[in-house]
Amino acid sequence: MANHEQIIETIKEMSVLELNDLVKAIEEEFGVTAAAPVAVAGAAGGADAAAEKTEFDVELTSAGSSKIKVVKAVKEATGLGLKDAKELVDGAPKVIKEALPKEEAEKLKEQLEEVGATVELK
C-alpha cells in the first residue's frame, strides 16, 4: 500500500475539480460529510430570522503556502486572466466575488480552502 507521503503528493498534483470529485467519492464511500459543523443559536427573536443574510461576499484573506494553486482556483472561479488573478491573490485580503447566494459562496469557499487558501464569507 502507498505510504502517506505518496498519497499527499498525489493530492497536491490534483486540480480543484479533481479534488472536489475525490471529496465526493470519499463522502459516498465512508458515509461522511466534509461540511463543517454549524453551531445552532438559540431563538433570540423573530427579527433575527427575518434578517438572515442571503447574499455573501467571498473574501480571500490569505493564499497560504500553495499560492500557485490558489491563483489557478481564483482564475477559474472569477474568469479573470492569469495576471489579474495573481494580482488579486497577491493583494489579499481582497473580495473575490460579491453578492453570491449562500450555497454558491460556500462552494467557492470550500474550493479555495481545498487548495490552501484562507477564506471568509461576509
UniProtKB/Swiss-Prot annotation:
Gene3D superfamilies linked to this entry: 3.30.1390.10, Single helix bin (1.20.5.710)
SUPFAM superfamilies with a match to the protein in the record: ClpS-like (SSF54736), Ribosomal protein L7/12, oligomerisation (N-terminal) domain (SSF48300)
Lineage: Bacteria, Bacillati, Bacillota, Bacilli, Bacillales
Entry function: Forms part of the ribosomal stalk which helps the ribosome interact with GTP-bound translation factors. Is thus essential for accurate translation.
Keyword Zinc: no
GO cellular component, one term: cytosolic large ribosomal subunit
NCBIfam families: L12
Keywords: Ribonucleoprotein, Ribosomal protein
Assembly, per entry: Homodimer. Part of the ribosomal stalk of the 50S ribosomal subunit. Forms a multimeric L10(L12)X complex, where L10 forms an elongated spine to which 2 to 4 L12 dimers bind in a sequential fashion. Binds GTP-bound translation factors.
Record bears the keyword Ribosomal protein: yes
Family of this protein: Belongs to the bacterial ribosomal protein bL12 family.
One GO biological process term: translation
Domain of life of the native organism: Bacteria
Name of protein: Large ribosomal subunit protein bL12
